[in-house]
Amino acid sequence: GREIDYMRISITDRCNLRCKYCMPDGIQCMPRWEILSLEELEAIAVCAADLGIRKIKVTGGEPLVRRDCPQLVRMLKNVPGIEKVTLTTNGVLLEQYLGELLNAGLDAVNISLDTLDPGLYETITGADALDKVLGIISRADRLPIPVKVNAVSIDFDNWKDGKERDKNGWRAMAALAEQYPVDVRFIEMMPIGYGKQFQGIDHRTLLLQLKEMYPDLETDHEVHGFGPAVYYKSQRFKGSIGLISAIHGKFCSSCNRVRLTAQGYLKTCLCYEDGVDLKQVLREEISRPEKESHFIWPEGLDVRDEGLQSRLRTVMEKTILKKPMAHCFETPGRITES
């Protein structure tokens, strides 16, 4: 069977960008009191480690809009059994928090970036911030932790905004692996959320085009992380190129992860809404008047309380054991995740 040893923890549903396929303008965010506190996240991490989780990825939204993100990284690094804590960010605030994150023990960072074209970047994200992101990537060889760049494989030429697009914009993204010691990973668009409205690029086609661009491209069997990417190397690379092909390279049989939403919902697959509300377990003893008064976060939570850990363990273990064997993205009618 699969060894589930990796948890993605979303610490906020807010973001400082408005990417059209993810969080476009007008999207409603949850009230802050609905989001898990640091202590609640720590309690879940302690239990997750007891259940075999060894690696944690901190995500959002944009995790760095939450100013206590470095503090959380430090807390997670101190949880017995947790071996690696990494971060996925859009990179806009990374320069501001990088020192704190490194001091907290962050092991690696993934930067989400879909284009190197300033105009297209602003069209996608609603922000003029590309230079900030590229500033961090350009220093990758001087950073003490590995840097990966995540690009969603979108057919921007099909965007219905009346502008002509560079059909080969992915080439500039791929070339980052020539310029810097970074892993550039192309991620197939999944038909969920706002992503359903956009046309993705088939990774079978993308791989053929990459091989034309780099005739000596070959599979790189070196371990680059904990995820499902298939990596490729070339003599021209300082880094590597990875393909995460959820649709045309289904990797469910080796999927090793579960996901915790910012509201405390533990999910086992992006394709299905099934899961369990851990926030309900964490806050079950808080009175209804307190809940309705929109308190910020419960105070004085003992994250290692045996009773709390026992209740969390029971529901988390049951949920993880029911992780689906495979997604159903190829049959959209069966998808239950909105």
Where are the language model's segments positioned?
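Auxiliary Fe-S-binding modules of radical SAM enzymes
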Residues: R2-Y6, A172, E178-Q179, M189-S338
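Radical SAM/AdoMet-radical enzyme domain recognition
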Residues: L38-V58, E62-D183
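Glycine-centered loop/turn positions within well-structured domains
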Residues: L17, P118-G119, K250, V276
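Canonical Radical SAM [4Fe-4S] cluster-binding loop centered on the CxxxCxxC motif
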Residues: R2-L38, D50-L51
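Conserved beta-strand segments that form the floor/walls of ligand-binding pockets within enzyme
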Residues: Y6, S10, K57, T88, ...
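A short acidic, helix-capping loop that chelates divalent metal ions and anchors anionic groups
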Residues: I27-P31, D117-I124, G193-Q197, D277-L278
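Residues that scaffold the ATP/ADP-binding catalytic core of kinase and kinase-like folds
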Residues: R18, C22, R66, G119, ...
